[in-house]
Amino acid sequence: MRNYGIDIAKISVIPNGLQDMSDRLDSIALRKKWNLSAEEKIILFAGRFDEIKGILFLIKAFRNVLKIYSNCRLIMAGSGNYDICFQEAKDICTKITFTGLLNKKDLNEIYQIADIGIVPSLFEPFGYVAIEMMMHELPVVATTTSGLNEVVNNACGLKIPLTILSESVEIDVMLLSEKIIYLLQHPIEAKLMGQNGRKRYLDNYASEIFRINMVKTYNSLFQ
């Protein structure tokens, strides 16, 4: 901006806002609806099935998690290249639920019954899914790619640094496994992170906050 002579003081950054879809539904009834047992710990990925979303690293990490917590289930909600998922997950496929592309109502139900949200993207301009997870009080494990690093702070989740190589970007699978296991081992801390995430959503990313910030910015132009 300095190269173009732009006055930084005249720039306002307004984060996108999302409508609050957290309905506090009966989680026991929802688990029955989705054929999930009450004992299973649900780890949730929501998004496009593409390598840029880090799904292969997630499946590898989940395999490690199962060695410690066999009562876990990975729900992968979305659509895209199923082949790359099936190939990597063939030995643990009974522990993974592929929902296909969900409408908003069904996706919000899945958010309500999940225990941990995972956003392992290798690149993400803005963390819509992370915000949705925070909206539903999920502790989030996310990478440090630019969009996610801004949205998810240390109070509402755990971060995974990306490894930048000459021709690729990678995630440390063992570290991702350890972060998930940590949240499973510390449910009270995980719950607090979820509550912090909910507050962060309400304070920064709720649609009403977006509206207020937009009006304030427009009004400032005429002062």
Regions found by a protein language model. Give the residues of each.
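A short, well-ordered alpha-helix in the C-terminal region of glycosyltransferases
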Residues: 182, 189-204
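Short alpha-helical donor nucleotide-sugar binding micro-motif in glycosyltransferases
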Residues: 101-102, 109-114
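A short helix/loop element that forms part of the nucleotide-sugar donor recognition site in Leloir-type
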Residues: 23-36
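Carbohydrate-associated surface elements
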Residues: 17
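Aromatic "clamp/platform" in nucleotide-sugar-dependent glycosyltransferases that forms part
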Residues: 122
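Nucleotide-activated donor-binding/catalytic signature segment of Leloir-type glycosyltransferases, i.e.
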Residues: 86-105
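Conserved donor-binding/catalytic core segment of Leloir-type glycosyltransferases
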Residues: 37-53, 59-62, 75
